[in-house]
Design a protein with these regions (language model features):
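Chalcogenol-based redox active-site neighborhoods
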Residues: 1-115
């Protein structure tokens, strides 16, 4: 039959550039290495509630890093499953921390030698 199978979100084309404009990825003259009116490369990570939790917009000379996108996805999934936030430099398999003053203090004291 072809196609990509069942996906839980719509696939769209942006023929009028309205989506690119709404998401702020449409290049403007003098603000980007892209020609005016071209959509810059962008990644938006949306949580299970439909909230954009991370966005990354790359101008033409900057390459994307799929490993960082995967790390951010892992961090979001970790938060959704455990309710703990992921500190700077966090990678999958590491501990998170409570986003309270005492939780941050506890995490920092436990990991002081590594920081």
């Amino acid at each position: 039959d072809g196609g990509i199978g069942s996906v839980p979100f719509p696939l769209v084309a942006d023929l009028t550039r309205g989506i690119s404009l709404a998401y702020g990825v449409l290049s403007e003259e003098g603000e980007s290495y892209y020609p005016q009116g071209v959509a810059m490369r962008a990644t938006f990570i949306v949580d299970t509630k439909g909230i954009v939790r991370h966005q990354l917009v790359n101008d033409e000379p900057l390459g994307r890093n799929i490993d960082e996108v995967i790390r951010v996805l892992d961090a979001l999934q970790f938060f959704e499953e455990n309710g703990q936030v992921c500190p700077a430099g966090w990678t999958s398999g590491q501990t998170g921390m409570s986003n309270t003053p005492s939780g941050v203090a506890s995490y920092l004291s436990e990991h002081a030698e590594k920081l």
